[in-house]
Amino acid sequence: MSVSQLKIQTLTLNDSEPSLPGKPITPSKEQIRDDVVLLWKEEPAAEDLDLPHLYDKMKIRNTDWQFDINTLEDVLVSNNLYSVDDSQMDSYNDKIEFPDISEVMHLVNDKLPSKVEIRECEELRKGRGLYATRDIQQGELLFHEKVPIAMVPPMDKLKLIRSGKSCSMCGVSLSNSSHFTMLHGLDCNGCNSIWCSTNCKQKDITHPYLKHFGSKNKNIRPMDWNMFERHCQENIFVAAYSIGVIHAASLIDKAQSDEINQQFEALAKISQRVRYESSDSNNIGGTFDAEIGSLKEENPEPLWKKAFDLFIRTFPDTAEMGYEVFLEYLGRFHINQLSGQLYFLYSFLNHNCEPNVRYDINNKLELKVYARKFIKKDEELVTTYVNPLHGVSLRRRELRVNWGFICNCDRCAKEIELRKKNAVSIRETVLNSNSSSEVSLRSGLNVTSPIALQRSNGGSSSDLRRKSSIRNRKPDLKEMLKNSKEFELEAPAALGRNRSTSVRFDDIVSMAVEE
């Protein structure tokens, strides 16, 4: 028996091999804008880069792009990406309609524990909110919603659901054997659908009416639903798909129908057209409805109208509903949804960049809301609609585009004021030292803009923002991980002696091979 000789060979990883530079292209202003926003999402500290450093960063990220620093500046100015002047920003908060609180109070308070109640908000345009009726301790459970208004299967799992590889209700991947599935009655007799548990099968009340052509419900047409569902899936139209499932659920059981309709009508509403016209991103790195993966069309009307036509064909009872009402349903879903579901009680929580509540959603779509810190009696319960680790510009942009308001919470106000002070201080330093050539002071850029911030003062505003944002209330690591879809670890300000050595990976690997 021969023994193979081994030698050590160093190879380059496949994904690190240098690629040939692409053909130079001139990006559109929309592409530049959305890549700036994407950069802020990936690296929040980049929000405070001055113009030259930001330009360098953009060129490194997009080696085949040909554009000059003036183009970048024009994009930042025209899209108010660095503006902290509220008068320059469009919002649609004044167009959002809130049902009278007297019409919804009994619906909400009947479902809330005695420690929480709904009230009208004193602040203009906030509508309604949830308030503590007594002191609440940190970590205390505030309220629990066992199910959303109507459970909506995840649209991104529809292909797997149709093939029986994911649960027809919750979308979880299935690993049970066929014998186990059949033994426990978790398979469907009329199609390939399978459920992960008896609980999911019982909750999937719309399945036989939407998926089986033999349905006896005259208000639901499964064949048309199949076309509607595929249209939504192909166009990542989550809102329309969700509205369809919710409406189907309301048609199946009379008692449940009344509750679903009452809860849905109690939610704040706005036309999707108004939201679209106020947005300014195509979502390739943008922010408009990005949480549920939506793409923004240049002209969404054909997409909306086709969805509407298929919707009223699927549900004959909606024939008199009207196209504009359908758009209101879409807008209502977007401004109230949480993780692609409509939770009735949670929808009454208002936003703050320093929230005092947090939530947990398990794989069965049960929602629990806890006190993130001590809450005083009569204090409003507030959640965060956006990633709290993002910078003030990106947070306010996401809130303005998706929920229609410009946030002026204490945290935003402090960070904006800090930017203004730094901008003025550095501007004076630059002017006094006659080094204005390094600073962009074009008339379109207000001195309150971080574009005017240079690193000549020995420290970046990102350092100041990071230290000041939630200094006194900054949660620990576990808290930061809760309710955030993204998470960035900051480099420590100082390295202690006991700090363990980091493992560094490069783009080569050594391996033993046979000679």
Curated annotation (Swiss-Prot):
CDD domains: SET, SET_SMYD. It is an enzyme of class 2 (transferase). The keyword Transferase applies. One of its GO terms (molecular function) is histone H4K20 methyltransferase activity. Its main location: nucleus. GO terms for biological process: methylation; negative regulation of gene expression, epigenetic; telomere maintenance. It is found in: Nucleus; Chromosome; Cytoplasm. Residues 452-476 are annotated as: Disordered. SMART domains: SET. Its EC number is 2.1.1.-. InterPro entries: SET_dom, SET_dom_sf. It catalyses: L-lysyl-[histone] + S-adenosyl-L-methionine = N(6)-methyl-L-lysyl-[histone] + S-adenosyl-L-homocysteine + H(+). Belongs to the class V-like SAM-binding methyltransferase superfamily. Histone-lysine methyltransferase family. SET5 subfamily. Histone methyltransferase that monomethylates 'Lys-5', 'Lys-8' and 'Lys-12' of histone H4 (H4K5me1, H4K8me1 and H4K12me1, respectively), thereby controlling gene expression and remodeling chromatin structures. This is Histone-lysine N-methyltransferase SET5.
